A protein has these predicted regions:
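Aromatic-lined carbohydrate-binding surfaces of glycoside hydrolases
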Residues: 1-33, 50-55
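Extracellular glycoside hydrolase catalytic/binding regions
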Residues: 26, 50, 54-71, 76, ...
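Acidic (Asp/Glu)-rich catalytic clusters
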Residues: 34-41, 98-102, 125-131, 165
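Conserved, mostly hydrophobic/aromatic
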Residues: 47
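Catalytic-core region of carbohydrate-active enzymes that cleave or remodel glycosidic bonds
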Residues: 128-134, 154-165
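Active-site clefts of carbohydrate-active enzymes
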Residues: 133-154
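Conserved small/polar residues in nucleotide/adenosyl-binding loops
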Residues: 176-181
Length: 182
């Protein structure tokens, strides 16, 4: 898959090597532009993996395309060498949620996927989060606001997040993850 050129060489995104090179270029470019801003109250502390899955052989779909096990570790190593973190927010039980630390990700916050549908088991979610050293993403949107249709349902689900996080000790883990980079 042709992407463009980098340092005079045509990049082929079907290879992990070229994708890693492009990611490194992107990181360097973002840092360069950020440094030009001379921001007084903002720090660039890390980078975020947009994919909600980290696909490895036998875990997730289309490993041949995604190759997370080949791409994420060298990218994490590069980021760590320049004092940047690698962050990830998988959906509930996404591919890689048990392997994120092995791949070099620094902070991972799993989504409960409960706020909108309320059908998944929060008990299983909290068990998975604790067993795998994950933080929790507290999902919500404008539906929680007073005056929105069914806001009482969404408020109840959000309260269930908060109560479950406190009960299972997940609230402290998520907070500690955030404080670690200050």
């Amino acid at each position: 898959v042709y992407w463009g050129e980098l340092n005079g060489r045509k990049m082929d995104f079907s290879t992990a090597e070229d994708r890693i090179a492009a990611y490194k270029w992107y990181v360097d470019e973002v840092r360069r532009r950020f440094d030009l801003g001379n921001y007084q109250y903002i720090d660039l502390a890390g980078f975020y993996i947009i994919s909600e899955e980290l696909v490895t052989p036998g875990d997730g779909w289309n490993h041949e395309l995604k190759k997370s096990d080949e791409i994420i570790p060298p990218l994490a190593e590069y980021l760590h060498a320049i004092n940047q973190s690698l962050n990830w927010i998988p959906y509930n039980r996404a591919a890689g949620y048990k392997k994120w630390q092995q791949l070099g990700v620094d902070y991972a916050y799993m989504q409960p996927n409960y706020f909108w549908e309320g059908q998944k088991s929060l008990s299983q979610f909290f068990s998975d989060v604790k067993a795998n050293g994950l933080g929790m993403e507290f999902e919500f949107d404008e539906n929680i606001l007073e005056g929105e249709q069914n806001s009482d349902v969404y408020k109840k689900r959000f309260r269930e997040y908060m109560e479950g996080a406190k009960k299972h000790g997940v609230y402290a883990v998520s907070y500690t993850h955030l404080r670690a980079h200050e």
